[in-house]
Amino acid sequence: MAAAVQDSRVSPGEILKRSPKKKKKMKMVAKAAASKLEDEVKDSSDGEGSCDSEMDHSDDGAAEADSEDNVESCEEDNEDAAESSAGTNSGWADAMAKILNKKTPKSKATILTKNKELEKEKEKLKQERLEKRKQLDKKREWEMLCRVKPDVVKDKEAERNLQRIATRGVVQLFNAVQKHQRNVGEKVKEAGGSVRKRAKLMSTVSKKDFISVLRGMDGTSRNSPAGKSPKARQTEVKSEESPGWKILRDDFMMGASMKDWDKESEGEEPAGGRAEAAASR
């Protein structure tokens, strides 16, 4: 019983010290109290500093009153300078605004000096183009000089005559080619199967043979042999030996000179003689 009585007489502080959870709570409470004390000390020190600064401001008040006059005079000078600079800046700004807001056409350059140079170059190019056009016009006029468009309605007879002459010439040419081929074929048959003779014969064939055949065709096409006298046939044989068309002769216009330009050729009759012969008939 005595031991139980002694245990009941133990103080509550000792009981708290014995339990670990209660020890932690006590530590947290002590820390909070210490932090509160530190905050109070800081607040008191800040109040003392503010009081000292107020005392310093009161001592400097007289010096500030003396310097206010100087500050006002400086401010007036600065205001005058600002007004003058503002006037110049506003004029400059107005001029720049006019330049920037000015609308220039697309054909002209924004820089005037370059615009003048471009205009000079354009004028030079225009002059060169005009000169080229003039040269082309002169060339076309020269090419079209003495050119006349044919009128089919008015020149029907002339066109028909030209067509007849063309058809006659083509027919005569093809007949001459056929005749020349026939003559060459006959000569090849006469030569036989020897290659040497054929080669020799083909080497003798030339343009002159074909031209002689063409000249003979020209002479025979003008006059047919049917119903002619032996004298006419003799003349035809002579004409076959000599070319029918004088222009195809090798010696055509070889003996002519400038003195005989107004004289008629030997084969041609004077126009008066032909007219008299026609009248007598």
Curated annotation (Swiss-Prot):
Keywords: Acetylation, Citrullination, Coiled coil, Isopeptide bond, Phosphoprotein, Ubl conjugation
Coiled-coil features, chain-numbered ranges: 63-144
Modified residues annotated as Phosphoserine in this record: S11, S58, S67, S206, S265
Disulphide-bridged cysteine pairs: none
Record keyword Phosphoprotein present: yes
Modified positions (Citrulline) in chain numbering: R9
Pfam family, any one: Rrp15p
Residue numbers bearing the N-acetylalanine modification: A2
Comp. bias (Low complexity): 272-281
Post-translational modification: Citrullinated by PADI4.
Protein name as it appears in the record: RRP15-like protein
Gene: Rrp15
